[in-house]
């Protein structure tokens, strides 16, 4: 019969501590790109939905990651990640 593996001791860094550090990094990045009142309302919505739980922390992390990814991908003005907008230059007359 299979048995669950034994506890191999403490993790290198506690998961909760790592999660809170990630949340702080995302929050500090988000305030550089989004209005504070908007982020506050988002936080209130998450808090009203999940309360003061780890599920709420995970939800706000997931939401901020998605928002920042989309923001950078669409083309943040001070990011090198976004889509570059290039003008098309015609080489010669059109063959329509």
UniProtKB/Swiss-Prot annotation:
Is Transport among this UniProt entry's keywords?
yes
Can you state the subunit structure given in the record?
Homooligomer, may form homodimer. Interacts with p6-gag region of the Pr55 Gag precursor protein through a (Leu-X-X)4 motif near the C-terminus of the P6gag protein. Interacts with host UNG. May interact with host RAD23A/HHR23A. Interacts with host VPRBP/DCAF1, leading to hijack the CUL4A-RBX1-DDB1-DCAF1/VPRBP complex, mediating ubiquitination of host proteins such as TERT and ZGPAT and arrest of the cell cycle in G2 phase.
GN (gene name)? vpr
Q: How is it modified after translation?
A: Phosphorylated on several residues by host. These phosphorylations regulate VPR activity for the nuclear import of the HIV-1 pre-integration complex.
Q: What processes in GO biological process is this protein linked to?
A: DNA-templated transcription; monoatomic ion transmembrane transport; protein homooligomerization; regulation of DNA-templated transcription; symbiont entry into host cell; symbiont-mediated activation of host apoptosis; symbiont-mediated arrest of host cell cycle during G2/M transition; viral penetration into host nucleus
Q: What does this protein do?
A: During virus replication, may deplete host UNG protein, and incude G2-M cell cycle arrest. Acts by targeting specific host proteins for degradation by the 26S proteasome, through association with the cellular CUL4A-DDB1 E3 ligase complex by direct interaction with host VPRPB/DCAF-1. Cell cycle arrest reportedly occurs within hours of infection and is not blocked by antiviral agents, suggesting that it is initiated by the VPR carried into the virion. Additionally, VPR induces apoptosis in a cell cycle dependent manner suggesting that these two effects are mechanistically linked. During virus entry, plays a role in the transport of the viral pre-integration (PIC) complex to the host nucleus. This function is crucial for viral infection of non-dividing macrophages. May act directly at the nuclear pore complex, by binding nucleoporins phenylalanine-glycine (FG)-repeat regions.
Per the annotation, which location comes first and is thus the protein's main one? virion
Looking at the record, which segments are called Homooligomerization? Answer: 1-42
According to its UniProt record, what is one Pfam family this protein matches?
Answer: VPR
Record-listed Phosphoserine modification sites: 79, 94, 96
The identity of this protein, by name, is Protein Vpr
Q: Does the keyword Transcription regulation apply?
A: yes
Compartments (UniProt record)? Virion; Host nucleus; Host extracellular space
In its miscellaneous comment, the UniProt entry states: HIV-1 lineages are divided in three main groups, M (for Major), O (for Outlier), and N (for New, or Non-M, Non-O). The vast majority of strains found worldwide belong to the group M. Group O seems to be endemic to and largely confined to Cameroon and neighboring countries in West Central Africa, where these viruses represent a small minority of HIV-1 strains. The group N is represented by a limited number of isolates from Cameroonian persons. The group M is further subdivided in 9 clades or subtypes (A to D, F to H, J and K).
Annotated Gene Ontology cellular components are: host cell; host cell nucleus; host extracellular space; virion component
> What HAMAP family does the record tag this protein with?
HIV_VPR (MF_04080)
UniProt keyword list: Activator, AIDS, Apoptosis, Cell cycle, Host G2/M cell cycle arrest by virus, Host nucleus, Host-virus interaction, Ion channel, Ion transport, Modulation of host cell cycle by virus, Phosphoprotein, Transcription, Transcription regulation, Transport, Viral penetration into host nucleus, Virion, Virus entry into host cell
The record's comment on protein family reads: Belongs to the HIV-1 VPR protein family.
